[in-house]
Amino acid sequence: MQEFDKSISFDGRDIRLKLGLLAPQAGGSVLIQSGDTAVLVTATRATGREGIDFLPLTVDYEERLYAAGRIPGGFLRREGRPPEKAILISRLIDRPLRPLFPQWLRDDIQIIATTLSMDEEVPPDVLAVTGASIAVIAARIPFFGPMAAVRVGLIGDDFIINPTYREIEIGDLDLVVAGSPDGVVMVEAGANQLPEQDIIEAIDFGYEAVRDLIQAQRDVMEALDIPLVIGEPPAVNEVLQSFISDRASESIKKVLMQYNLDKNARDEQLDEIKETAITNAIAELPEEDPVKVAATEEPKAVSNLYKDLTKKLMRSQIITDGVRVDGRKLDEVRPISSRVCLLPRRVHGSALFARGLTQVLSLATLGTPGDAQDLADDLHPEDEKRYLHHYNFPPFSVGETKPLRSPGRREIGHGALAERAITPILPPQEEFPYVIRVVSEVLSSNGSTSMGSVCGSTLALMDAGVPITKPVSGAAMGLIKEGDEVRILTDIQGIEDFLGDMDFKVAGTDSGITALQMDMKITGLSMEIVAKAIEQALPARLHILDKMMETLSTPRKNLSPYAPRLLTMKIDPEQIGLVIGPGGKTIKGITEQTGSKIDIADDGTVTIAALEAEKAEKAKQIIYNMTRKLNEGEVYMGRVTRIIQIGAFVEVLPGKEGMIHISQLAEGRVGKVEDEVAVGDEVIVKVREIDAKGRLNLTRLGIHPDEAAAARKAVAPV
């Protein structure tokens, strides 16, 4: 491809596209740049494997620390496994791309986005999403594009397209909208309890900007004479399709209308129909029968056509009758139950949330500031994270046996969504300095486990005594669209997710939305349908919230006795070195002496943690005494540390030592210092003078008995 360089003026910033310059052996590549952030996106296609019945699409987002002029840490000094942020961006690219590939496509497709340069203003993620569309089109891969993405922020009453990191931080909305010529294909958002109407307006605002980027891609395609390839789907074997439909349709309808069946019973009956009415019937046919010939030539065609028939009949039942496979109305939520304090209080907070056959156990743990997740080797400006949400999806939750692996992209993505939903209602760090981790264990899955983990986490946090500002609930919305007929489903279960067109997760409080995530299986939705789905989610969320509040309506007043007790104090940042000591000797001594854990921030904030409040208070007193300013005339109890000919040195506070001249040891003449004090003696002294160099001159003379008594009882203020 010839080199092509084009700048697009986009909402006050330039987006620069360079094609044909880098990665010439990739199927298609583009260097997309805004500000000093530049991302190389490549798309490569290879012949698919024989016999597969899915699209083998792989999307990877890669970060290199050289992009920010940094060298990785660790012994190897090179990047290791992708950080969580990179995995989430990989998903962000994948989700709007996947529904735009033809359903019949079976070629291997690999898309790699690599951030080559990054500034402190422009996030690379939405650039990578738009760049992926350009790379796919340049590679002549069948694709219902173009597709583009923008970020929408909200500062005050004004929406902003592609806000900077700083604008995202201070704003009330972080929304990514991706769209195609057919409409919105993906939404991802975190919000500060925004009303539904504000979210709808933001998505509409973002999609208008997406349309401009789609047109810009069309201009590039025209300039380079790159056609948009769609391709032709393979012909359906009508003989086999008719045989399956004739044999199984009525039986499938009967199963779909048995509303009392649970997921497993329904699946068993559908499998039995396939086995008896289709597989066994084909096996009994003569070898030369066209149906048997077709089934032999395409072994997976029977399963795929049976699945398509089941999908068609379920969707028809919803469109025509307005009834779902479990008998619910379109806007009805499944039965809900929840419990808290399910486990002993060694687990700081626990909650079990169930919605239908979906069951999630959420467990909250309170930690110290030192437990925060360090993001130092991440390209993004966030240094650490004080709220962590981890989501686990074991195979037994769907009745399967599989090897256990480290968390996959789905688990990481669902955990991040729940984390985003909860973060806006957490107390400020100044009021509640704990680091909080919630783990959601999916014990049974039949749809909407991510929103189940949001609900369970809210209850677990309240059970742990975290003073959240408001409880959060969530619901997953679905869609069945056949031509102009549209049905939006509330609280979708597994089969509706699998056979439907949309999975739209909405989480929030009774005041507004805190998180959104919409994924499509069709090529786009109108804003009218998007708005209706968001509005229909509101009564469902509030209903779920009411059910949760019946279990636990407010956070517990007391923490678990096994949660650490935290105390905070401020010291002069210049005194941090004094508290830490050479090689950490001083702070290590304090922790060993008091049985506490101490964290010191760069601004001088000291956080002390211990299982017993008394131990934390003791450590606080020691640090207070070490760092407090001494004044002339103050009286202290100190310890004699050494003796010289002209006097004795006394440690009045940890790390603060002064000298009592021999003339100040006692009334009258003192012959030898040893006649009055010995090393290790505890003595009451007064600060007589602090000289220009900060040295303390002490005395034992002129101390009132009340002052001496107070010094013996002195403690650090709380």
UniProtKB/Swiss-Prot annotation:
Instruction: Kindly indicate whether the keyword Iron-sulfur belongs to this entry.
Output: no
The enzyme's E.C. designation = 2.7.7.8
Q: Which residues form a coiled coil?
A: none
Q: Which SUPFAM superfamilies match?
A: Eukaryotic type KH-domain (KH-domain type I), Nucleic acid-binding proteins, Ribonuclease PH domain 2-like, Ribosomal protein S5 domain 2-like
An example Gene Ontology biological process: RNA processing
Please report the stretch or stretches of sequence annotated as the KH domain: 564-623
PANTHER family referenced in this protein's UniProt entry, alphabetically: POLYRIBONUCLEOTIDE NUCLEOTIDYLTRANSFERASE, POLYRIBONUCLEOTIDE NUCLEOTIDYLTRANSFERASE 1, MITOCHONDRIAL
Q: Which cofactor does it need?
A: Mg(2+)
Q: InterPro entries annotated for this entry?
A: ExoRNase_PH_dom1 (IPR001247), ExoRNase_PH_dom2 (IPR015847), ExoRNase_PH_dom2_sf (IPR036345), KH_dom (IPR004087), KH_dom_type_1 (IPR004088), KH_dom_type_1_sf (IPR036612), NA-bd_OB-fold (IPR012340), PNPase (IPR012162)
Q: List the signal peptide residues.
A: none
- Name used for this protein in its record: Polyribonucleotide nucleotidyltransferase
Q: CDD domains under this entry?
A: KH-I_PNPase, RNase_PH_PNPase_1, RNase_PH_PNPase_2, S1_PNPase
Q: Which UniProt keywords apply?
A: Cytoplasm, Magnesium, Metal-binding, Nucleotidyltransferase, RNA-binding, Transferase
